[in-house]
Regions:
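Short acidic/histidine- and often glycine-rich active-site loop of Leloir-type glycosyltransferases
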Residues: 52, 108-122
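Short alpha-helical donor nucleotide-sugar binding micro-motif in glycosyltransferases
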Residues: 72-77, 165
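Short hydrophobic beta-strand element within catalytic cores of glycosyltransferases
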Residues: 102-105
């Protein structure tokens, strides 16, 4: 899997630019209450308004400097979670997979089509308990490996930014 753990904690990553209820901001707050101290939640793409909404045990990153920095953040994650309620196509899912990180997402929009049985878990829309269970299963059972995630992402290589993420992943130190 991606980078995995920091100080014996599983890293659960969320990335969006324009966080809202539609993107699952409330789900992140719920998961922060439900997951044990073995998990560290990191949310990228926040702003001051979002920071006020998030619990204190969530790490907030406003913006990344560039795609390389974002790819580095992806590779530190044990799992990428996408609680979106409406998504045309889950490009953030592909970005995570390209960095070797398995994905948990709701069955909504194009997000489920990004995954296969070797790269992540799809849960029913708004099933926060199901998302929590999938996160725990991925982290504790180590059921997905980064090679399978990258292979899945390669099926989408015609999409913008795909090749850049693969190269950044290959060249990481």
């Amino acid at each position: 899997m991606g980078g995995g753990q920091v100080k014996n904690k599983y890293i659960v990553l969320f990335v969006s630019f324009g966080w809202s209820i539609y993107k699952g901001l409330d789900v992140i707050a719920e998961l922060a209450k439900m997951l044990t101290n073995d998990y560290r939640i990191v949310v990228v793409g926040t702003d001051n308004y979002v920071d006020e909404f998030l619990p204190n045990n969530v790490i907030s990153i406003h913006r990344t400097q560039n795609q390389k920095q974002l790819a580095e953040i992806y590779t530190t994650a044990t799992v990428f979670a996408n609680p979106t309620r409406e998504e045309m196509f889950g490009m953030v899912n592909i970005e995570a997979l390209a960095c070797g990180v398995p994905v948990v997402t709701f069955r909504t929009g194009g997000s489920p089509e990004c995954l296969d049985s070797k790269s992540g878990i799809v849960v029913e829309k708004d099933d926060v308990d199901g998302m929590k269970d999938a996160i725990v299963e991925i982290c504790e059972r180590k059921m997905f490996n980064e090679i399978n995630c990258i292979k899945r992402a390669q099926q989408f290589k015609g999409l913008d930014k795909f090749n850049e993420y693969i190269e950044l992943y290959k060249n990481r130190e």
